[in-house]
């Protein structure tokens, strides 16, 4: 079955083989590449990620989305063209043993964070601090018994660099792929001042969360569970022990797939 | 003499009385209030901040600016209308005992940061970690002997909240003045998740800088010198000892005033 993670800036795809119960990460498509360049319809981009052989075998897909409505409209119509019906999963108050910490308005918790919580609860039989470093850096506390204790949302690296460009007259146009170095040091020019500043803010937020975890997990052991494209880089700078799960969200979607046909 | 700090989002004014050598903070004018509302010319706003009695006594002003060119044009023409000639100060490689850490391109260091370095060197006879929490959060390392070791630039609180609004579909429109609480806690709704996330990133960056200061100051004592509107709030969350200087930048401008007539 096709698993879809429609994120803020790109959509990621994976294939769950129900026979082997294995999840294979297929690839990601940046939203800008199809929203700006209509010469290459999304349907063709999808066929570069998902093989037609897989699509013939299974016409159902399951996904979650925090993407903008324009992205969703195009994604749904392109998948329908390929004969695929998508079951979009919503955040709930309780599911698969996890209790949502947003007690007043559970549906307001991002569905990407919800799926990662479900996936983590199934994979990590331990208190977990989930660090998802993508377009935004999200941090969530999840107890071993499935209680979600809430979390944080911080602008990711590129959003931070953009924010300085917009808010000031002289600090424009730095992009993430210009950054190579791990570790923290004082910046001796504007480029390093800004890129190291973003690194300090992102790693600083994670360090604050790790410190707070003692209180939240009553000084019991916990795992730092890292996912998202920028996660590994940040943890190397922090030199903190962590376990990496690239498919945490997809593991959550796979759990939801069980209920599709039940 | 009128002292002017033309910042990213507002201009701040102070009066230096050369006889008493005292600096009186006069007030600030947000740039949007004159750029958007031409019905109230900047000249009138200035006269609400600076008394005509002061303007008659002294027709020279000294300032530094990181503001956009539209702001500077309006500011200069309005001050000229009031008969005031402004000596805008630029960042240098060396001045008043301070050596700029941007060795390759010293002029690229923000003049607001340069003035704060000059003011700090004169006021604080100690190694200093300067934390200026304004539109951007800037952090600078300054040795007791006047050597500047470089620094960081991080989006300030409102820029971080805006960044999430721009980079994601569902996290829009949170403003700084909605925030009351000190201290850090997991967010149990989207508002708290974002505002606490910004708090964690800003305090986390400062905490990372404090940690790095041991290395930069070779484990010698140092002061955490805090300035900028958001500084006190952040330091209360960090519960770290610090000394507050509201007029650090103006103290730097006052040092430059000595050379105006020499």
Swiss-Prot record, chains A, B:
CC cofactor: NH4(+); K(+)
Entry function: Catalyzes the phosphorylation of pantothenate (Pan), the first step in CoA biosynthesis.
The keyword Methyltransferase belongs to this UniProt entry's keyword annotation: no
Superkingdom of the organism of origin: Bacteria
Binding, K(+): 132
Binding site for substrate: 102, 110-113, 190
HAMAP family reported in the protein's UniProt record: Pantothen_kinase_3
Localization terms from the record: Cytoplasm
Designated name of the protein: Type III pantothenate kinase
Example GO BP: coenzyme A biosynthetic process
Cofactor annotation comment: A monovalent cation. Ammonium or potassium.
Transmembrane feature ranges: none
Keywords: ATP-binding, Coenzyme A biosynthesis, Cytoplasm, Kinase, Metal-binding, Nucleotide-binding, Potassium, Transferase
Top-level EC class: transferase
GO molecular function per UniProt: ATP binding; metal ion binding; pantothenate kinase activity
InterPro entries assigned to the protein according to its UniProt record, in alphabetical order: ATPase_NBD, Type_III_PanK
Pfam families, sorted: Pan_kinase
Family: Belongs to the type III pantothenate kinase family.
Annotated metabolic or biological route of this protein: Cofactor biosynthesis; coenzyme A biosynthesis; CoA from (R)-pantothenate: step 1/5
EC assignment: 2.7.1.33
A GO CC annotation given for this chain: cytoplasm
Active site residues per record: 112 (proton acceptor)
Catalytic activities: (R)-pantothenate + ATP = (R)-4'-phosphopantothenate + ADP + H(+)
């Amino acid at each position: 079955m096709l698993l879809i993670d429609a994120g803020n800036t790109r959509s990621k795809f994976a294939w769950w083989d129900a026979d082997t119960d294995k999840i294979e990460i297929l690839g990601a498509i940046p939203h800008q590449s199809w929203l700006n360049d209509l010469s290459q319809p999304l349907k063709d981009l999808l066929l570069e990620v998902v093989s037609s052989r897989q699509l013939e075998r299974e016409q159902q897909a399951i996904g979650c989305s925090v993407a903008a409505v324009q992205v969703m409209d195009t994604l749904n119509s392109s998948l329908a063209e390929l004969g695929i019906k998508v079951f979009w999963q919503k955040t709930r108050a309780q599911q698969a043993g996890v209790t949502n910490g947003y007690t007043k308005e559970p549906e307001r918790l991002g569905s990407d964070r919800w799926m990662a919580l479900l996936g983590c609860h199934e994979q990590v039989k331990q208190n977990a601090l989930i660090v998802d470093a993508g377009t935004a850096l999200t941090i969530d506390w999840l107890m071993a018994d499935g209680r979600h204790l809430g979390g944080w949302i911080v602008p990711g690296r590129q959003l931070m660099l953009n924010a300085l460009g917009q808010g000031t007259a002289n600090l424009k146009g730095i992009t993430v792929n210009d950054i190579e170095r791990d570790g923290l040091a004082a910046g001796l020019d504007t480029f390093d001042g800004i890129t190291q500043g973003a690194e300090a803010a992102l790693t600083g937020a994670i360090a604050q969360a790790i410190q707070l975890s003692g209180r939240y997990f009553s000084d019991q052991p916990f795992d730092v569970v890292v996912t998202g494209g920028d996660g590994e880089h940040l943890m190397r700078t922090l030199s903190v022990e962590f376990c990496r799960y690239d498919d945490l969200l997809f593991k959550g979607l796979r759990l939801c797939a069980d209920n599709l046909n039940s």
